[in-house]
């Protein structure tokens, strides 16, 4: 199956400002690279390369297809990336939240994609994923997307807590903290996580584990979505979520109920015997 991405810039700016138009296309390619890196075990500066399958004169309408799949990726990842990109742009057009499957960095790149667009679809951009020539995902993108993503990436609250999920996208360097992406098992968030050097051993043990719990300083946006985590602890978890009989009787937070089961606790709140 062949997979392609169609981009169609509308309005007078599409045929007038070549620099802005090319910058928009470049921002789309940067967004695809970021989404691809968050999907794979280890990211790379050299992601999948793309070629123009169609490029029409007199307007900015083009169709991109994979030219060479990156070594750290595969065809299934590339197809997921395209669907995630288009679906996410559609979500960002309607809500001030980080789109499903996007990191905060992807949201910042999405801002760049939409920054030069107009305020209505007739001066915006149409994007579509095509599989074997058939449209399977579409979105209309306007300047509203840039405003919504800017609001979504603005930090509003810092707390201390934890999230559970699977680590991917590990980046290491001599002069920078190790970084990775946590795909949460609840809510499906894709969260950038930074680790201190003191967590190097724990990080390597946790790498490619199905389930880990990362504890640390959590930065959230106004919608309660996690923008990033500065980890202070990593805990390895069983492959499948497991609860003991005691946990099932008393709940996930038995201290909250004083060890009582849910029925007794609610009756006590109501003043029952």
Where are these regions (language model features)?
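Short nucleic-acid-contacting surface segments enriched for D/E, G, S/T with interspersed K/R
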Residues: 197-215, 226
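Short boundary/loop segments of OB/S1/cold-shock single-stranded nucleic-acid-binding domains
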Residues: 143-160, 203-204
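OB-fold/S1-family single-stranded nucleic acid-binding modules
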Residues: 219-247
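Protein-protein interaction interfaces in oligomeric scaffolds
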Residues: 1-142
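Extended, charge-rich, solvent-exposed interface segments
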Residues: 238-273
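Short aromatic-glycine-enriched beta-strand elements
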Residues: 173-183
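OB-fold and OB-like beta-barrel modules that bind single-stranded nucleic acids
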Residues: 164-169, 209-218
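Structural detector for short beta-strands of small beta-barrel domains
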Residues: 158-175
């Amino acid at each position: 199956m062949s997979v392609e991405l169609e981009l169609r810039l509308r309005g007078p700016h599409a045929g007038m400002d070549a620099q802005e138009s090319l910058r928009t296309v470049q921002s789309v390619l940067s967004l695809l690279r970021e989404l691809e890196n968050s999907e794979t075990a280890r990211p790379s500066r050299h992601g999948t390369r793309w070629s123009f399958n169609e490029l029409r004169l007199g307007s900015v309408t083009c169709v991109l297809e994979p030219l060479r799949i990156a070594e750290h990726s595969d065809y299934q990842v590339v197809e997921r990336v395209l669907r995630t990109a288009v679906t996410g742009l559609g979500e960002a057009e309607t809500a001030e939240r980080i789109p499903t499957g996007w990191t905060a960095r992807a949201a910042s790149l999405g801002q760049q994609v939409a920054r030069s667009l107009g305020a209505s679809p007739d001066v915006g951009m149409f994007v579509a994923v095509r599989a074997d020539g058939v449209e399977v995902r579409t979105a209309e993108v306007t300047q509203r997307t840039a405003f919504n993503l800017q609001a979504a990436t603005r930090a509003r609250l810092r707390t201390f807590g934890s999230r559970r999920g699977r680590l991917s996208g590990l980046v290491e360097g001599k002069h920078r903290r190790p970084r990775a992406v946590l795909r949460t098992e609840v809510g499906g968030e894709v969260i950038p996580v930074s680790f201190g050097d003191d967590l190097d051993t724990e990080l390597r043990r946790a790498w490619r584990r199905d389930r880990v719990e990362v504890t640390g300083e959590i930065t959230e946006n106004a919608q309660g979505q996690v923008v990033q985590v500065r980890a202070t602890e990593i805990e390895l978890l069983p492959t499948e979520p497991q609860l003991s009989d005691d946990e099932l009787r008393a709940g996930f937070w038995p201290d909250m109920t004083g060890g009582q089961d849910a029925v007794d606790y609610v009756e006590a709140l109501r003043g029952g015997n």
